[in-house]
Amino acid sequence: MFALSLLLLPLGYIVYLIGLAVYRIWFHPLSKFPGPKAAAVSEYWEAWWNIWPHKGGCLFEVERLHGVHGAAVRMGPNEIHVNDPRYYHELYRLGSRYYKDPEMHKVLGAPSSTVAETDPVLHKIRRGALEQLFSRQSILKLEPMIMGKVERWSSKLEEHFQAGKPVPMEFALKSLTMDMVTTFAFGQEFGAVEDPGFMSIPVRLFRNYLMSLHVIKAFPFVKLLQGLPYFIARHISPTVEMGRHLEDLSDGHINSFVDKWQNGDKPNFPTVIGRLLTPNEDKGFQVPSKQGIKDEVITLVSAGNDTTGITSMVGLFQILTNPKIYDRLLAELKTILPKVDSVAPYQELEKLPYLTACIKESLRYASAAASRTPRLVPPGGIYLPDGRFVPAGTRIGMAIYLIHFNPDLFPNPRVFDPERWLRDPAEMTVQNKFLVPFSKGTRACIGINLAHMELYTIMAYLIRRHDLKLYNTTAKDMEWWDMVIPEFKGTFKAWTGKRTE
C-alpha cells in the first residue's frame, strides 16, 4: 500500500501539470492572444530563447512573432507583449496606473533602491529626493568634472596609439563613463580609465552582472551563491569574486565620503551620496541606512554606465563607417573647436545641429536598454487600441527596440541616418514623440540630463581630437544578443591617434 502511494504521488503531479497546461493553453483569460503554446504553458519558454540554446534571442523571437500574429502576442502564462505605438504612451506615462511587477524587480537585487521600488508612493518619495540632483541646472555644475575625465581619457587613447595598440572601444568608452558616473555618485572615481587595457574589474563586473540577469530571473536560486563562503563561491563563479571586490570598493568609497562629509569636507560639485545624506522632512525623505545608500548608488552606476557607453560606441561605429557623416560632423565641430585642443562650453555643443542629430540617431539606433520593461495591468483591466481586453494583474510590456525600429515611425530604420533629425520640425513630431531611449513617464530614467552631457562631450572631443580608424572590425562584429544590455558578437577596435590640426 505504501509503495502504491509513492507511485501515485508522481503520477498525480504529472496529471496536475497536464491539467495546468491544458488550462493555460485553452481556458486561461489570455488564451485568446496568439503565441507559442510553450510560452502559454511556462515562463521557461523565455529562458529557452534567452539562455540556452539561443542566447539573448527572446527579443528577436518576439519581433518575429509580431510579424506573424500582429500587435499583441502572448509570451508567458500571464504576460503579453504589445507592439502598437498607439499604446506606448498609455503604458508608460506620468500618473500611470500600471505598477512595476515586484517579481521582475526582485531579479535586480538592491531592494531598497528607487529603481526596485514598486510602491508608487514610496517611489515618489525616493525619486523626489533625487530629482533636483539630476535636474539640468544641477548637472551643468558637473561640466568641469566631466571635461577633466575626457582630458585624461584622451591622453590614454593617445598612449595606446603611440604604443601601437588599437583600442577596444566598448571597454574604453565604458571606462570613461564609469569614472564619470562614479565620481558623481561617490565623490571619487573607480579609476577605470587608469587600467592599461580598459578592462578594470568594475567595468567587467557591471557588464557581466547585467548579462547574468536572464539566468537569475529563470533560476532565482543561483543568488544563493552570494551567501556561500567566499573561498567556495569564488571557485564556482568568477562574477562572485568580482562582486566581492566591488562590495569592498563601494564600502570604502562610501565610508570615505561619509567621514569627510561629517568633518565638513564636501565636494565642490553635486553628488548622489551627498544628496542621500541630506534629509528632507517636508517631502518625507529620511537618510537611508548604509545598505540603502549602497543599493541606491550601485543601481544608479549600473544603469548609467553601460547604456551610455553602448550608445556612444554604436554611434561612433556607424559614423566611422559612413565617411560623409564623419566628414560633415568633423567640419561642424571645427566651427567651435578650431584647434585640436580647443574647449567649448557644453551649452554651445548642444546648439550644433548635426552633432545633435548624430546623438539622437545614436540613441535610436543603439537602443541600449532594448528589452521590455513590464508593468501590471491595473484593477478593472484595460482595452488595447485594437479593442481586445486584458485582465487585471496581467504582466504587459513593450520593447524600446521595436519602437525605434518601427518603419511606420522611422522610415528605413536599419539605416543610420542623422538627416532624419534635420527635417522640418512639423515632419519630426512623430519621431521626437517616439524617440524613447530613456522610457517615459514616472519611471523614466532619472539620468537623462547626465547622459546627454556625457554623450555630447564624448562624441565631440573624441572625433575632434582623434584621427579615428577602424581596426579589424566589421558590421558583423556589431551584431548583438539581448542580454538585458546588448552583448556584441565581436569586438570594436580602433586606432586613436591624436590629430595634428
UniProtKB/Swiss-Prot annotation:
Keyword Kinase among record annotations: no
Any GO CC annotation of this UniProt entry = membrane
Report how it sits in the membrane: Single-pass membrane protein
Q: Which UniProt keywords apply?
A: Glycoprotein, Heme, Iron, Membrane, Metal-binding, Monooxygenase, Oxidoreductase, Transmembrane, Transmembrane helix
Q: What happens when the gene is disrupted?
A: Abolishes the production of arthrobotrisins A to D and arthrosporol A, and accumulates three new epoxycyclohexenol/sesquiterpenol hybrids with different oxygenated patterns around the epoxycyclohexone moiety. Leads to a dramatic decrease in the conidial formation but develops numerous traps and kills 85% nematodes. Develops far more adhesive trapping devices and traps and increases the number of captured nematodes by the traps. Shows significantly increased ammonia levels in fungal mycelia.
Q: Return the EC number.
A: 1.-.-.-
SUPFAM superfamilies for the chain? Cytochrome P450
Q: Which family does it belong to?
A: Belongs to the cytochrome P450 family.
The entry's protein name is Cytochrome P450 monooxygenase AOL_s00215g280
